[in-house]
């Protein structure tokens, strides 16, 4: 990490751009192109001071009037010597500053490299580093609150407590191994089992929170399904209030899933417009239909659209394929195009929709009130749909300090640790030898340590930080 790096840290479109520079020669390098308007040179300034002056390139040609913030190691975001240059948000000015830095030997930062350096320099553990990306990507109050809680170390604190209990268990087991010939007991099996139960309970709670955390972070998944040409893409566009999906009278226009995020009453939803389900010999369309069924299986809420002009056999064929997959999911049955069909056809379609849920919808979370007519094109009864979505999300209130798992990597590590603890409990109950029980305990500790980055490979680190933006 001896190289000095730089990158634009702000998004395009504002009035000011911030260029971040970090590394051993950050202050020295910037001082070569920055002339303070009064006071000491940049290299003599104390940490966390902001200096006004001219940024010069091409000899001493003034490029812009800027503010330069100096942060000295280890009291910076990265833990290194750091400078932030706040300039006017001209793309030309920004480009010239970056080119000047590159000409002086500074390297363009890789995605997430500033945060990776913060992690490697001990400024934050890996779970808190990942929270930085979640904070930047947050689109709702709940997602923001979870990211802040993790960034402040709430999750790390929980993991630290778990690791301490596991270390206590391991040390007791290994002490007995060291004194096995002297028949010394450092803890009875009942006490060890009680400690295991406590650890099991906490890990289970954390792992169990992932379904909520993932929905908060990525949006509650809502699958829009039905036969071809029922208005699924029109409904997606109406929900998002923008033309995201292509709408056409030609059957099979949507051949792959189209997604969009929307926040309703503080809850983020991820709507998935899917390919229409029908019998087809088109290979590409069949692949799209298979993906429809996959997305439906992964969703929490399903919106089944029915075309009121379809006959009973068509409706039943679709219901037979879709409704069994909706088991355990919230379902709304929406008879679309109420603005263009006669009341009799509309009534028959609604009647058939209700019959099909009764016939094929075993285990589906559905009530008769969850069936109604809409016009996705005209917006008829869309307010009722939005109310249904918010009520169906069942998103618990998240308070400051709540620890909820939002990251797939963390969840998978917790599941592995939980399996290790169950092996320990089985071993203790069955009289398994102490060395084998200790090995399961050490595996649990390794899995928890992987979350905070204490035993993480370079490949995993690379994958994590590659998902960050350049300036982070």
Ranges and model annotations:
Residues 286:
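Cytosolic ligand/metal-binding cores
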Residues 1-145, 149, 153, 325, ...:
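A glycine-rich (often HGG/GG-containing) alpha/beta subdomain
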Residues 122, 229, 273:
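Conserved G/P- and acidic residue-centered "switch" motifs that form tight phosphate/ATP-binding loops
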Residues 304-306:
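Redox-cofactor binding/interface segments in oxidoreductases and associated redox assembly factors
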Residues 107, 268-270, 365, 370:
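Conserved beta-strand segments of alpha/beta enzyme cores
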């Amino acid at each position: 990490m001896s190289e000095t790096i730089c990158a634009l840290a702000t998004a395009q479109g504002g009035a000011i751009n911030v260029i971040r520079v970090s590394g051993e020669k950050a202050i020295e390098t910037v001082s070569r192109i920055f002339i303070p308007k009064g006071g000491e040179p940049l290299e003599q300034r104390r940490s966390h001071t902001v200096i006004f002056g001219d940024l010069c390139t091409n000899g001493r040609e003034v490029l812009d009037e800027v503010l330069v913030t100096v942060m000295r190691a280890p009291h910076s975001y990265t833990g290194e010597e750091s400078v932030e240059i706040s300039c006017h948000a001209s793309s030309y000015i920004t480009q010239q500053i970056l080119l000047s830095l590159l000409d002086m030997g500074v390297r363009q930062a890789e995605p997430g490299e500033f945060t990776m350096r913060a992690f490697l320099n001990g400024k934050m553990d890996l779970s808190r580093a990942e929270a930085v990306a979640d904070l930047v990507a947050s689109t709702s109050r709940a997602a923001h609150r979870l990211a802040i809680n993790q960034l402040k170390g709430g999750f790390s604190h929980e993991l630290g407590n778990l690791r301490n209990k596991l270390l206590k268990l391991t040390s007791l087991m290994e002490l007995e191994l060291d004194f096995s010939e002297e028949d010394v007991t450092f803890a009875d099996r009942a006490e060890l089992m009680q400690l295991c139960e406590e650890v099991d309970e906490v890990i289970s709670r954390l792992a169990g929170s992932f379904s909520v955390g993932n929905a908060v972070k990525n949006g509650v998944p809502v699958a829009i399904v039905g036969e071809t040409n029922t208005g699924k893409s029109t409904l997606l566009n109406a929900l998002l209030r923008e033309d995201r999906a292509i709408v056409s009278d030609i059957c099979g226009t949507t051949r792959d899933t189209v997604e969009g995020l929307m926040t309703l009453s503080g809850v983020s939803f991820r709507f998935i417009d899917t390919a229409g389900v029908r019998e087809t010999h088109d290979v590409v369309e069949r692949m799209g239909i298979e993906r429809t069924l996959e997305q439906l299986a992964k969703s929490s809420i399903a919106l089944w659209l029915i075309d009121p002009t379809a006959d009973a056999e068509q409706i039943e064929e679709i219901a037979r394929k879709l409704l069994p997959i909706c088991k355990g999911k919230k379902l709304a049955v929406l008879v679309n195009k109420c603005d263009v069909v006669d009341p009799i056809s509309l009534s028959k379609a609604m009647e058939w929709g209700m019959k099909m849920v009764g016939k094929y919808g075993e285990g589906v979370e559905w009530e008769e009130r969850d069936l109604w007519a809409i016009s996705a094109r005209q917006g008829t009864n869309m307010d009722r749909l939005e109310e249904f979505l918010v009520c169906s999300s069942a998103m618990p209130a998240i308070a400051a300090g709540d620890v909820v798992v939002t990251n797939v990597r963390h969840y998978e590590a917790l599941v592995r640790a939980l399996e290790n603890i169950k092996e320990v409990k089985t071993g203790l109950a069955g009289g398994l030898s102490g060395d084998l029980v200790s090995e399961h305990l050490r595996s649990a500790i390794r899995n928890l340590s992987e979350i905070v980055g204490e035993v993480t490979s370079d490949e995993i680190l690379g994958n994590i930080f590659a998902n960050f933006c350049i300036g982070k």
